[in-house]
Amino acid sequence: VEGTARVEGTQIQKLDANWAPKGETLSIDADSLCLGHGLIPSIEAPQLSGIPISYRSDLGGWVPDMGEDGATSIEGVFVCGDGTGIRGAAAAELHGTLAGLSAAEYLGSQTAKERATLRRRFNRAARFGLAMTALSIPRPGLAMLTKPDTIVCRCESLTQTCILQEVEVGASSINAVKSGLRAGMGPCGGKYCQTA
């Protein structure tokens, strides 16, 4: 971003398949800029419940292990929506209904026919969301774009320089960096910076 008190322009550059810079940098005049920081599944409740989690880059990160309609390995516990993977708002809503119908069936209701129809709608809606998620999965070249003043931990306003200085004075593990700087310990609990 160019400008000090306000946005005056931005710089863009082509990236290769791994998001590493490639080619010339182009400056563009602009008075505003929209940034997308990616979406990450909210897995706090399932994780605290003891539901096993797995890393699924195609779903946006760590997600609870579950069956097709939200059933987990804990009997009678179902999960749904963006907490199970980033598939888009329409798919999240439909997935919530599917999980609800599965829970109702677990309790004795007959919902198989209704779930089959809803599952087709969910699959259609999820295709778009999953395609968008695939485009936003961070790739290795992203690290090459960081500069000393790049914010790594948004909640604690920690830059790349802060983190590197902590390592230089002896922090030899992620936990040591967390202890020294509170990196990953803000309101998001490391949700956004954990992979940085």
Could you describe each region identified by the protein language model?
Residues V1-L181, M185-P187, K191-A196:
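Residues forming the flavin
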